[in-house]
Amino acid sequence: MPRPAVFLDRDGVLNQEVGYIHRLEDLQLIPGVAQAVRRLNDAGWFCCLASNQSGPARDYYSIDHVHALHHRLQELLAASAGAVLDAVYFCPDLSRPEGGVVADYAGWTTWRKPNTGMLVAAAWDHDLDLSRSVMVGDKATDIDLARNAGCYGILVQTGFGDRVLEGSYQHASQPDYIAEDLAAAVEWICTHLAPR
């Protein structure tokens, strides 16, 4: 039977929002994040990264660098609290009008948020029930993705979240819940939803 998942954006949700991360050591966890992911692990949730990462399309760095950043993220989560992301999905693509310049990644794709490609692929690969899943992000596009995929959407106030709420970044959104940070989002998830 398909199970639900918690999909997590990366920058501003799991790690500090510092713009495009050119040096691995600049990827630093937001305090309390590892413990929050571990709580989801312990509660039986499938935890999945779902993140737009257009650095390769913009020619800021290679796709291998993105993989290295995700390896570091997994290492930090494990070292801090024994936490695990069960799967990692990201979109390196960006259309030319939006700034994509590297041919292999400069195009429109169903994987780029708020399109549902990453979540649909994860659901297919891991037998997930999107209607019982949650998307946690700090941008309106994360909440739009949740709506488009039929998931619950939680907006965290870390990263760009506060700016989304005040209307100074992206556009207005209607999340199912607004959380101070990932720990508060996980508290809501564990209180209101069941992983099985």
UniProtKB/Swiss-Prot annotation:
It comes from the Bacteria. Belongs to the GmhB family. The keyword Cytoplasm applies. The record marks 112 as: Contributes to substrate recognition. CDD domains: HAD_HisB-N. Monomer. Its cofactor is Mg(2+); Zn(2+). Mg(2+) binds at residues 9, 11, 138-139. Substrate binds at residues 9-11, 17-20, 51-54, 112-113, 139. It catalyses: D-glycero-D-manno-heptose 1,7-bisphosphate + H2O = D-glycero-D-manno-heptose 1-phosphate + phosphate. This is D-glycero-D-manno-heptose-1,7-bisphosphate 7-phosphatase.
